[in-house]
Amino acid sequence: MFRPCIDLRNGKVVQIVGGTLDDAGTSTLTRFQSEHPPSWFSKLYQKDGLTGGHVIALGPGNESAARDALGAWPGGLQYGGGVNLDNASAWLEAGASQVIVTSWVFRDGLLDRQRLADLVQRVGKERLVLDLSCRKRDGRYWVVTDRWQRFTSLEVDEAVCHDLARSCCEFLIHAVDVEGLCQGIDLELVESLSRWCPIPATYAGGAKSIDDLKTVERVGSGRIHLTIGSALDIFGGSGVRYADCVEFNRTTDTTSTISTSP
């Protein structure tokens, strides 16, 4: 299924090339910046029944914009960006359906299981999404944190996915090496996730056409979802029509209902 997104940088809805993100902004390559406020996109997604999407704050200076997005559709979108034990509950109260966390549960490149356990105790696993966004190195996928610039020691594989699935309701996984390039999805990663993930996962990165959405739906057996960013027409792209994604979800929902009916 198609999952929408609202990426925020400096208070604006943007699309960036994932591997270029930095706090200073000196090397960040921005492909698109919208004239619409974040709430405009939230209301659009709500109108079209697009559940499971997310709001991501890419760096500081986005709190007001994030609250604008979440407040426009309470309970309709997940939120990620600087989430920690102290503010997770506040973001849920601000309207997030779930909070997305990555960097805070890692210290010095290592997964901090106590921090993860504390967060689960605070908000509950059903309100927690783990971001396992990754980059490929030596033929394997490794979780990256700190604006996707720092490699951790955590490899994304079947054992890790099954282990961490006990602490969250869903995974969000950006293929950082292809994020924002509109040159096609990382099919190897999508195929692997379809085998490894015992819970739903949303993949993001590289989608360039509606065929990528069809591929992820087929390969992922309905458990792996796709976020399309830079290629989408509402984000200035030319590869994918937003209306086609909405129609794909409607058609897929209808087909699934028919196929599972007694």
Ranges and model annotations:
Residues 1-5, 51-54, 76-78, 97-100, ...:
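Structural preference for beta-strand elements that scaffold enzyme active sites
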Residues 6-7, 45, 53, 91, ...:
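Conserved, mostly hydrophobic/aromatic
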Residues 9-24, 92-178:
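Conserved anion-binding
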Residues 18-62:
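N-terminal beta-alpha supersecondary unit
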Residues 32-45, 84-90, 153-162:
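Short, acidic/polar
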Residues 49-65, 103-109, 173-182:
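Glycine-rich, proline-tolerant flexible connector loops at the mouths of alpha/beta enzymes
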Residues 64-99, 188-226, 237, 242:
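Catalytic cores of alpha/beta
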Residues 111-122, 213-262:
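C-terminal helical cap(s) of enzyme catalytic domains, especially alpha/beta-barrels
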